[in-house]
Amino acid sequence: MAVGKNKRLTKGGKKGAKKKVVDPFSKKDWYDVKAPAMFNIRNIGKTLVTRTQGTKIASDGLKGRVFEVSLADLQNDEVAFRKFKLITEDVQGKNCLTNFHGMDLTRDKMCSMVKKWQTMIEAHVDVKTTDGYLLRLFCVGFTKKRNNQIRKTSYAQHQQVRQIRKKMMEIMTREVQTNDLKEVVNKLIPDSIGKDIEKACQSIYPLHDVYVRKVKMLKKPKFELGKLMELHGEGGGAGKPSGDEAGTKVERADGYEPPVQESV
C-alpha cells in the first residue's frame, strides 16, 4: 500500500475550520409603516426587508405585507378593543403606504360579552362599497333585560331573532353600499353602525353590546396610486407649494429685461 498524504483532508485547509458568520441584519433596511389619514397617529412602526440585490427588489418584498394594529395605537386612546389590519400597497422612499385590509375585535372583549341567561344574535353580509371594494361584515348583539323585569332570563323568541338579524343585515348593507372605503372606515372607528342597529332593534327586543365584530376584505379594485395618495392626504395638491413655500408675485415694468451678470 502506497504511503502518502490524504488529499481530501489537506484540500479544504484546516479540518473543521469554522465558516465566517455574516450578520443577516447587515443586508437589511428599516422602513417606516404609514397608516392612512383617517387615523390620528400616522407612523405606526417599522418593518425590516432585505436590500435590493439583482432582480430581487426590496419594495416587492414589502408590498402585500399585512400589519395588525390596535385602535388604541392608531387613535392614541387607552381603551380600545378593535384591531385594524393594514396592507402595504406602495413604497415611496423609506415609507410603506398602507390601506385598510380588515378589522377584528380582541379575543378578551368577545369572551367578556358572551354570558348566560341571554340570547346571542349574529349576522353577516357581503357588501360592495361605491369605489369597488367587496367587504364581508359580521355583526353580533345580545339581548338584555327590559326595564322593571323580574325574570332572570332574557331570551328572545326565534321569530324575534330572525327579525333582528334581518334588521342587522339591512343596516350594514345600507351603511356600506352608499359610501366609499374611507367613509366606511370612519364609521368603523367609533362603531356608529352598531349603535344604529341597537336603536333600530329596540322595538323588537332590547339589545346591548351590539358591534360589527369583524370585517373581511374579499375583493379589491385595480390598484391606483392617485387614490392611495388621497387616502394618505397627499393627493390632489401634492405638487403645489403650501404656506410659506409659495412665492409672491413681483411687479415688473413692461419690456423689462434682467441685467447682464459679469460672472455666474
Swiss-Prot record:
Q: Which residues form the signal peptide?
A: none
Localisation: Cytoplasm; Nucleus; Nucleus, Nucleolus
* Region described as Disordered: spans on this chain: 232-264
Is-annotated flag, keyword Secreted?
A: no
Q: Does the keyword Cytoplasm apply?
A: yes
As one GO molecular function, the record gives: structural constituent of ribosome
Q: What keywords sit in the KW lines? A: Cytoplasm, Nucleus, Ribonucleoprotein, Ribosomal protein
Q: Which SMART domains match?
A: Ribosomal_S3Ae
Gene Ontology annotations for the cellular component aspect, listed alphabetically: cytosolic small ribosomal subunit; nucleolus; small-subunit processome
UniProt-listed InterPro entries: Ribosomal_eS1 (IPR001593), Ribosomal_eS1_CS (IPR018281), Ribosomal_eS1_euk (IPR027500)
Give the Basic and acidic residues compositional bias ranges. Answer: 242-255
- Coiled-coil stretches are none
Primary location: cytoplasm
Q: Kindly state a single biological-process term from the GO annotations of this entry.
A: ribosomal small subunit biogenesis
Q: Record's superkingdom?
A: Eukaryota
| Pfam families attached to this UniProt entry | Ribosomal_S3Ae
According to the record's subunit comment, the protein's assembly and interactions are: Component of the small ribosomal subunit. Mature ribosomes consist of a small (40S) and a large (60S) subunit. The 40S subunit contains about 33 different proteins and 1 molecule of RNA (18S). The 60S subunit contains about 49 different proteins and 3 molecules of RNA (28S, 5.8S and 5S). Part of the small subunit (SSU) processome, composed of more than 70 proteins and the RNA chaperone small nucleolar RNA (snoRNA) U3.
Tell me, in a sentence or two, what this protein's role is: Component of the small ribosomal subunit. The ribosome is a large ribonucleoprotein complex responsible for the synthesis of proteins in the cell. Part of the small subunit (SSU) processome, first precursor of the small eukaryotic ribosomal subunit. During the assembly of the SSU processome in the nucleolus, many ribosome biogenesis factors, an RNA chaperone and ribosomal proteins associate with the nascent pre-rRNA and work in concert to generate RNA folding, modifications, rearrangements and cleavage as well as targeted degradation of pre-ribosomal RNA by the RNA exosome.
Q: Which family does it belong to?
A: Belongs to the eukaryotic ribosomal protein eS1 family.
**What protein name is recorded for this chain?**
Small ribosomal subunit protein eS1
Q: Which gene encodes it?
A: RPS3A
